[in-house]
C-alpha cells in the first residue's frame, strides 16, 4: 500500500525538471570534500544503478524518457576551475566525460564538461507508469490520506500507521517523503530545506538547447528542452528565508529574456529539495522503529537517480541482498567538513528562530491584508499570520506547529513557509509539505472572513 497525502505528483516529483544524469553539476566535488574516497566511489556506482533502472523501466513502460547529453558549464572565468575539477573526478571514477572550451549557449561560457547519452523525463508520465506497475503487482495507491504517526501494533510483527483516513497495519513501513514526518533521529535538523524555481518558455525551435545544462556559479542556472519549450531553472534559497520569493522568480525570468529575447512565458512553478550536509542521501532503518520503519531522504536535488538508488538500497536491506556500494554507503564515515556544514545550517536555523520572532513582535497584526498578500504581526504577545487570498481573509497563529519558529509569507506560492525546517502551509493553515504533521491553528478569536466587496465611489 502506498499512502499519499494529496495526489501523486502534487509536490516535488511533479515539479522537478527531471534531469536523469550521472553528471550532476559539481556534486562529485561536494561529496569528495566531505567524505572518504570510498564513499564517493560508492555514490558514483549508486547513480549508475539508479540511472540504468530508470532508463530500463521507462523503455518498457513508455514513460517518456529522452536521451540528452548532460553539460556542466562555467559562466565566469573563475568557474572554469570547478569545471576542470569535476571533469577530473568524473574521469577517475569511470565516467566518459569530455572537456569543452565552450558550452554552445547564447551567453559566454568559459569551459564545460559533457557526459553523453544521459536523459530527461516527464515526471508525471513516470509517476503514472509507476502507479500502473504498482496496481499490476497487486498494490494499492491511496490518495488524499495523510500519515500522522507510526507506532507499535499489538502484534510485535507489525507497525501501526496512523492516517487521516484511519489506521493501517504493516510488517514494514518506508517513509518516502521529502523529509521524514517522524522526528525520531532528528533528521529534520540534519537536512537543509531549499526552494528553487522553474519556468517554461516558448522560443523558436532553433534556439532550444541541445542538451541538459547546469552552471557551476550562484545563483544556479539550469536549462533543458521540453518538447517545443525551453525550461529554465534556479535562483534557489532557504525555505522561508527570502523576503520575496516572487522576486527570485522574476530574476530568473529577467535572465532568460536577456539571453532569449522575445521568449514567451508559458508557465512557472517552484519545488522543494532537502540537502544533506555530506551530499549523500540518508537511507536505512529509522531509529526507534523496531527494525520495521525505514526512511529515504536528502536527495540533494538529484531525486531521479537518488530516489531509485535509495529504493534499491532498501530492497537490499529488507531482502538481505545488499550490494557492495550499498554496504559502503551504509558504513559512510562523517568527516569534519560535513560536520561543519551541519553545524552551520543549525546556527542559521537558530538565527532564523530569533529573527522570525523579533519581526513578528515588532508591530501589531493587521485585521486584513490586500488580495494575495500575507503579513505577520502580534496580537497581544502571540505572533499572528494574516492573509487574504481569493477574497478570503484568514488569521492564524503564526507559530509553526512543528518546532515553534514563526512562519513567513511566500508571495510566489501564496503560502506560509517556516524558515527553520521547511514546513509549508496553505493560507488557511493546511499543512502542505515538510516535517510538520499538523496544520496551523486559527488565531484566538478569529474566523475565516470573506472580504467585503469594494463599493464604487460616487461620481460628484
Give names to the regions the model predicted.
Residues 1-15:
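Glycine-rich FAD pyrophosphate-binding loop
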Residues 31-133:
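Rossmann-like flavin
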Residues 66, 98-100, 140-142, 266-268:
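General small-molecule cofactor/ligand-binding pocket signal
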Residues 81, 87-93, 112-172, 176:
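Helical element adjacent to the flavin cofactor pocket in flavoenzyme catalytic cores
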Residues 117, 217-218, 227, 240-243, ...:
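C-terminal catalytic lobe of FAD-dependent flavoproteins
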Residues 149-225:
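Flavin-dependent oxidoreductases
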Residues 199, 376-450, 455, 460:
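Rieske [2Fe-2S] iron-sulfur-binding domain
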Residues 266-274, 292-295, 353-399:
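A glycine-rich dinucleotide-binding beta-alpha-beta segment and adjacent secondary-structure elements
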Amino acid at each position: 500500500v502506498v499512502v499519499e497525502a494529496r495526489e501523486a505528483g502534487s509536490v516535488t516529483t511533479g515539479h522537478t525538471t527531471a534531469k536523469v544524469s550521472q553528471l550532476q553539476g559539481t556534486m562529485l566535488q561536494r561529496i569528495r570534500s566531505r567524505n572518504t574516497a570510498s564513499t564517493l566511489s560508492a555514490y558514483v556506482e549508486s547513480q549508475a544503478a539508479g540511472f540504468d533502472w530508470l532508463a530500463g523501466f521507462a523503455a518498457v513502460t513508455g514513460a517518456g524518457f529522452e536521451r540528452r547529453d548532460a553539460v556542466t558549464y562555467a559562466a565566469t572565468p573563475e568557474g572554469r576551475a570547478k569545471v576542470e575539477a569535476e571533469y577530473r573526478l568524473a574521469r577517475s571514477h569511470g565516467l566518459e566525460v569530455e572537456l569543452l572550451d565552450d558550452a554552445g549557449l547564447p551567453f559566454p561560457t568559459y569551459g564545460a564538461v559533457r557526459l553523453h547519452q544521459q536523459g530527461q523525463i516527464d515526471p508525471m508520465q513516470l509517476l503514472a507508469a509507476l502507479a500502473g506497475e504498482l496496481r499490476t503487482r497487486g498494490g494499492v495507491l491511496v490518495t488524499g490520506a495523510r500519515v500522522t504517526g507510526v507506532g507499535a501494533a499489538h502484534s510485535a510483527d507489525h507497525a501501526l500507521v496512523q492516517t487521516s483516513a484511519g489506521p493501517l497495519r504493516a510488517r514494514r513501513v518506508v517513509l518516502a517523503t521529502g523529509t521524514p514526518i517522524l522526528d525520531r533521529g532528528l533528521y529534520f535538523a540534519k537536512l537543509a530545506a531549499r526552494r528553487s524555481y522553474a519556468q517554461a518558455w516558448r522560443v523558436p525551435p532553433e534556439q532550444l538547447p541541445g542538451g541538459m545544462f547546469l552552471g557551476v556559479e550562484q545563483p544556479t542556472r539550469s536549462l533543458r528542452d521540453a518538447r517545443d519549450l525551453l525550461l529554465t531553472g534556479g535562483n534557489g534559497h532557504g525555505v522561508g528565508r527570502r523576503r520575496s520569493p516572487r522576486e527570485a522568480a522574476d530574476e530568473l525570468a529577467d535572465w532568460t529574456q536577456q539571453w532569449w529575447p522575445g521568449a514567451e512565458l508559458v508557465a512557472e512553478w517552484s519545488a522543494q529539495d532537502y540537502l544533506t550536509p555530506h551530499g549523500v542521501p540518508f537511507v536505512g532503518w529509522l531509529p526507534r522503529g523496531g527494525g520495521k520503519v525505514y526512511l529515504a531522504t536528502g536527495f540533494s536535488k538529484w531525486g531521479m537517480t537518488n530516489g531509485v538508488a535509495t529504493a534499491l538500497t532498501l530492497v537490499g536491506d529488507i531482502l538481505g541482498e545488499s550490494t557492495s556500494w550499498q554496504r559502503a554507503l551504509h558504513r559512510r564515515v562523517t568527516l569534519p567538513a560535513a560536520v561543519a556544514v551541519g553545524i552551520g545550517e543549525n546556527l542559521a536555523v537558530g538565527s532564523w528562530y530569533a529573527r522570525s520572532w523579533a519581526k513578528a513582535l515588532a508591530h501589531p497584526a493587521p485585521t486584513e491584508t490586500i488580495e494575495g498578500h500575507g503579513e505577520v504581526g502580534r496580537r497581544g504577545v502571540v505572533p499572528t499570520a494574516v492573509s487574504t487570498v481569493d477574497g478570503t481573509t484568514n488569521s492564524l497563529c503564526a507559530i509553526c506547529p512543528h518546532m515553534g519558529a514563526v512562519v513567513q509569507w511566500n508571495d510566489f506560492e501564496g503560502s506560509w513557509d517556516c524558515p527553520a525546517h521547511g514546513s509549508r502551509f496553505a493560507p488557511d493553515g493546511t499543512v502542505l509539505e515538510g516535517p510538520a504533521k499538523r496544520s496551523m491553528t486559527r488565531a484566538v478569536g478569529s474566523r475565516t472572513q470573506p472580504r467585503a466587496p469594494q463599493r464604487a465611489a460616487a461620481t460628484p
